[in-house]
Amino acid sequence: LRKWPVLIVVLIMGLVLAGCGNSGGKTAGTSTGGNEAGKQEVIKVAADTTFPPFEMEVNGKVTGFDIDLINAIAAKENLKVQMQTMDFQGLIPALQTDTVDVAVAGITITPQRAQMVNFSNPYYHSGLSILVKKDSNIKGVSDLKGKTVAVKLGTTGDIMMSKMPGVNVKRFNNIDDAYNELQNGGAQAVLFDNPVNQNYINTGHNNVKVVGGLLTGEDYGIAVTKQKPELLKKINDGLARLMASGEYEQLYRKYFKSDDSGLIKK
């Protein structure tokens, strides 16, 4: 008879422990599943802030058309943007080494770059143009022979000028330095993306002009590491949703007003 109290205590303890174990396991499983379902994927995005109005730094904040666009895409696809800045020529190497997942910097889609990184569908139509002082006798690309032309290092303008004989090319990490070289007389022309050249004119620099029209037809794409094809799909899906809803055009108008030259129409 004395054994019964002991057995009863053992049975009660066993039931209590079993109940705690089952309850704890179910709660942990439910909690983990809920967190995973609602968790945002963090994407590391790199930008070159010397490319207004696409990327620029204002009062310590990175802003611009590309920045607004990638944030809008991220919101559509439940992604969280972790922004960092770097020089343009460092963007593709950073993608290749998985230092970053995405790069936005008005990056022209080219076959050479597409071998190294993936590109989203185009989001802006651009081209190169020549910027000179208003009193310059340069009228087009053929007049650049024998002249000094300032370019941004690693850009399509740099590539184009490096293939053109008889041109003295000055390369700069920052396009503002190239513009300063033109203003100071160290270069007779700047070859760069037309929307940025136009933005330079429209922000108080009335002594310069664009000549010769667009030299190339180029499309900008969002660059994505080749290691994450599923991320590329999300970015393309988000971009398509923005275009379908009209939000893409709203962002475009915010920066480019009534100028339709760069607008991608679907």
Summary of predicted features, one role per range:
Residues 80-143, 209:
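Acidic, polar ligand-binding/catalytic clefts
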Residues 107-115, 160-162, 183, 188-217:
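A ligand-binding cleft/hinge motif common to bilobed small-molecule-binding domains
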Residues 29-106:
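Extracytoplasmic small-molecule ligand-binding "clamshell" domains
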Residues 15-19:
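C-terminal motif of bacterial Sec signal peptides marking the signal peptidase cleavage site
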Residues 21, 67-76, 153-155, 221-259:
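Extended ligand-binding regions for polar small-molecule ligands
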Residues 22-28, 159-173, 209-212, 239-266:
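Ligand-binding clefts/hinges and TM-proximal coupling segments of bilobed small-molecule sensing domains
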Residues 49, 125-132, 198-236, 258-266:
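Periplasmic-binding protein-like
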Residues 83-95, 136, 153-156, 170-184, ...:
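Short helix-initiation/N-cap motifs at beta->coil->alpha
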